[in-house]
Amino acid sequence: MRRCGIYVYPHRERDILCVKIWTIHLGSWGNPMPNRACVQKVLPVTKQISSDGSVQIDTVRAVLPEFQFPSHPQIGDCLSWIETFFSRSLVGFYDQGYTPGEESCTNSTIKGMSGKPTSIISNIYTTTGPAKVSNDYAVRDPGVAVDHFDQYGPLKEGRSLNSAKISTQWSGSATLKSSNRSIFNIGLGYINTFLGVSNVRGFSTGSGRSKNVLNKLDDLSKRSKNYPNLVIDRNLYKDFLLNRDMFLIAYNKLKSNPGMMTHGLKPDTLDGMSIDVIDKIIQSLKSEEFNFTPGRRILIDKASGGKRPLTIGSPRDKLVQEILRIVLEAIYEPLFNTASHGFRPGRSCHSALRSIFTNFKGCTWWIEGDIKACFDSIPHDKLIALLSSKIKDQRFIQLIRKALNAGYLTENRYKYDIVGTPQGSIVSPILANIYLHQLDEFIENLKSEFDYKGPIARKRTSESRHLHYLMAKAKRENADSKTIRKIAIEMRNVPNKIHGIQSNKLMYVRYADDWIVAVNGSYTQTKEILAKITCFCSSIGLTVSPTKTKITNSYTDKILFLGTNISHSKNVTFSRHFGILQRNSGFILLSAPMDRIAKKLRETGLMLNHKGRSVIRWLPLDVRQIIGLANSIIRGYDNYYSFVHNRGRFATYVYFIIKDCVLRTLAHKLSLGTRMKVIKKFGPDLSIYDYNSRDENNKPKLITQLFKPSWKVNVWGFKSDKVKLNIRTLYASHLSMANLENLQCAACQSTYKVEMHHVRQMKNLKPIKGTLDYLMAKANRKQIPLCRSCHMKLHANKLTLNEDKKV
């Protein structure tokens, strides 16, 4: 909402001075459009003030554009008590007309409830100054207060303004209007010099709460991008942690995550979430009494062996963590290095592998790096100090510290660590990226020091010059094709140019705590670079894993990164450029690791001795569900390895193993005996048809069939592209006020204390007509609104939607 001010000008001649300044002059992002909507709110007050007699106006709230007095406080959510006001006044708006009147009041004080001291009305106004660059979302539509005129009477066209006392602090356009409808369009910067007026001072009428939270996030991101070295001095805690809209965004982003139905130490989940619950969290945050509950620590298996600790926190605590993550992402995402790809919007494993495929050609020595227990070894004090160097709001910083120090329960004992960001926490990945950004900058500096490009022009070898001479001579003498072909083959096997000074190149990519440094240089130089990186990591409290970090020659061995084998091609290919045959060497190969895929299929019980197995856990499922699960496995592999060079072999292997698995499972389930009988029943593609409905060709409608991936190689088949960070694009779909506000109970249509009922998965529903599950399945939703009474009845299995159906 944009605000405009109205000035009550006291004058015995019943004249009016209305000065208007466009907000484009107040700040670089001010909205130039004035707000006319508030006129409807002001006119009733105007008529009351303009009437004869004494009038008292109570509790004018400055958040709404109702009325603007001199000395009105700048803080938007402050209440001002206007007891009485001396004046004989006229009130009006430009292009809106005015109603003359005369009234008498008693002069008193204006008290601000925002903590500012009580002050007598004077010529110094508190709502002055333009919108700051550091607070660009404070859209201001100001008026200009004119103290009084002297005995010379009302303003006339062409008359000097020496008698008027106007005060301002900036240059802007203004419109002066008097009773004879004479209008002066002037710039306030020229009033002193051109018209001879002094003490011109402007005031604005709001603190900027009119813009919604997405605009504030977007402005925060733009400021971080445009001024990367400036400290964020905004009140992040108040603007975002005490904002209901932010909780709605966080809730809508998390509500469909199955992990939100997994409880921590307490049995709380997102089930039963309502506006009242959010308001209670906000109140505890406002009083700074909010504390994160300790998590539940479990151990999960690691792919490389061993166990990885996972901390499961309270889902309601995760709402606050999600808000912290969103704000930190808006601040730091524009600052992150392009080499970082983990846990970032628009980036993924595919974007990291694409960067390697396009930029790492020619690098011989590769450092496969890994930070030992990265998430569990980040020092809290150093992390907090790093955040404090960028963010000034200490309440926001202390809330992050509370999240880090929440602790966990293991072996019936509470433990609190002074290092590590707990894995399983929503805010943990962004904090790890912020901390590892130091490593990104360090390696970027190493790259700028190491990179060197040798001379471009190099001489041909004597053998190459001799063969070129023989080729030209053979063509000149019209030699037979066999002789020319023989010379051409020799030319391809001989170095063309003399090797000059070697060009040095260092390339770097990181995904979370896994990173690759590729060096086009000597092995000795590569070892020196690894030693420098190891030393730097030690200085910031991290350890480079000696067992997982190694140096590999990409022309002789393969590098495993993000589940993909990386190597240089040993085959020499040729291509024509402008009719000239050129040799292509050192092509980067990205291939699917067939041995790891086979191992994974064996561990999950889908394969034995390179043959499919009947899956016992699938037997209770329907045929359609079995084929659907098989399709999800095939599509998962197909989507991740969409770019590999060995796609034909990979896709064929996975497809026939999973198909064999489905055939054996269906033969077991349907007691058909052999796989051939299953093929006769469902066809070679294992298709299921609905014979009760027909398509346009009068054929049975296809319900599902086994997915068959394409064998075609597409080396550019990466699923991620460069995405410009846009806060509105990221979160606009999650800002739906209807999700938790103005809800109606689906069972009894009550609007009192309505909250959301959640289910973990849609497949857990039993959509019997007349039940609540039927309503949820019909709407294809995992959440449905229920009032508190119906929600408690549902969990007690006593809720009825009609007289004969129970949930």
UniProtKB/Swiss-Prot annotation:
What is the name of this protein?
Uncharacterized 91 kDa protein in cob intron
Q: What is its main location?
A: mitochondrion
Report domain Reverse transcriptase positions: 281-566
Q: Which GO terms describe its cellular component?
A: mitochondrial chromosome
Q: Which GO terms describe its molecular function?
A: DNA binding; endonuclease activity
Query: Which keywords annotate this record?
Result: Mitochondrion
Leftover remarks = This protein is coded in the group-II intron of cob.
Which PROSITE patterns is this protein grouped with? RT_POL
Q: Which PANTHER family match?
A: NUCLEAR INTRON MATURASE 1, MITOCHONDRIAL-RELATED, PROTEIN YKFC
Q: Where in the cell is it found?
A: Mitochondrion
Q: Give GO BP annotations, semicolon-separated.
A: homing of group II introns; mitochondrial mRNA processing
Top-level taxonomic group: Eukaryota
The record's annotation in InterPro entries points to: AI2M-like_HNH, DNA/RNA_pol_sf, Domain_X, GrpII_Intron_Splice-Mob/Def, HNH_nuc, RT_dom
